[in-house]
């Protein structure tokens, strides 16, 4: 798999510019702000870019998005109740269409979840992480994934759903089973599987696969475990660990 991430597709790395987005909405309102974002997006990633990615020999693009591409609040108020008129779905529709046209698969990556899945800038949480302690935000996340899975369940160009990017929590975890990240993963998997039993689901251990449970014991099927190994110096050693985990747990590792 040769992957390219279309970073910035969802408007100027919105998850790193939460305050800027809020200021725009305060000054110009939600509608005018969405018009500005739409104009930016349509010029930031174009058909030429997708065609060029394909020509480079890539076969997969990872498309990061956050909840505010679809919702105006972390409680889950839709920008438009009609999915066909929702700017988030309009943009994903276009990207998936272009990917299919140029022979690419798409990984749909929820980069920023309602309430924030970490305190890092990439979650758009402005130094706050409330997803794992706020059931309302979890409900909004579930509704968004159900809508996404319902919309793209028949799409041959969609390779996988990456449920949440680099989830982190504060404090120590006594066991893998008690990890609120895995509890939330389990909830999202069950919700998605009710509407889409076929697409691959990607689950991130971030830096260590040991943060994730045995998928067979958890009852998770058709999943891929994912790591983001920044700054590894002993690449061969780490890759051997991933290989051993793959063999011992019978789960693909990416």
Region spans (language model):
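Short, flexible, mixed-charge acidic loops at enzyme active sites
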Residues: 6-19, 116-125
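Charged, glycine/proline-rich intrinsically disordered loops and linkers
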Residues: 10-34
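Short, surface-exposed linear patches
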Residues: 12-18, 84-85, 128-130, 223-225, ...
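An active-site-proximal structural segment forming one wall of the substrate-binding cleft
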Residues: 32-61, 65, 69-71, 75-163, ...
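Alpha-helix capping and helix-coil boundary motifs
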Residues: 13-20, 84-87, 177, 235-238
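Short, small-residue-biased leader/transition segments that mark boundaries at the very start
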Residues: 1-2
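Extracellular glycoside hydrolase catalytic/binding regions
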Residues: 136, 142-254
């Amino acid at each position: 798999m040769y992957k390219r991430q279309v970073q910035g597709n969802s408007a100027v790395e919105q998850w790193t510019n939460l305050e800027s987005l809020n200021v725009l909405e305060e000054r110009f309102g939600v509608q005018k702000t969405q018009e500005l974002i739409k104009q930016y997006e349509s010029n930031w990633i174009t058909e030429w870019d997708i065609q060029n990615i394909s020509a480079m020999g890539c076969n997969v693009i990872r498309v990061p998005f956050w909840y505010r591409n679809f919702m105006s609040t972390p409680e889950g108020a839709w920008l438009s109740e009609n999915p066909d008129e929702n700017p988030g779905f309009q943009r994903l529709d276009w990207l998936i269409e272009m990917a299919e046209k140029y022979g690419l698969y798409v990984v749909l990556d929820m980069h920023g979840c309602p309430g924030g899945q970490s305190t890092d800038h990439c979650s758009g949480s402005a130094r706050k992480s409330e997803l794992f302690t706020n059931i309302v935000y979890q409900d909004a996340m579930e509704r968004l994934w159900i809508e996404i899975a319902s919309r793209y369940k028949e799409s041959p160009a969609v390779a996988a759903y990456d449920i949440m990017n680099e989830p982190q929590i504060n404090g120590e975890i006594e066991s893998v089973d008690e990890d609120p990240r895995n509890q939330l993963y389990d909830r999202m998997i069950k919700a998605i599987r009710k509407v889409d039993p076929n697409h691959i689901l990607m689950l991130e251990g971030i830096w260590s696969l040991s943060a994730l449970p045995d998928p067979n014991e958890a009852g998770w099927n058709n999943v891929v475990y994912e790591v983001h190994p920044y700054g590894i110096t002993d690449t061969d050693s780490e890759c051997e660990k991933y290989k051993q985990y793959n063999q011992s747990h019978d789960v693909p590792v990416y």
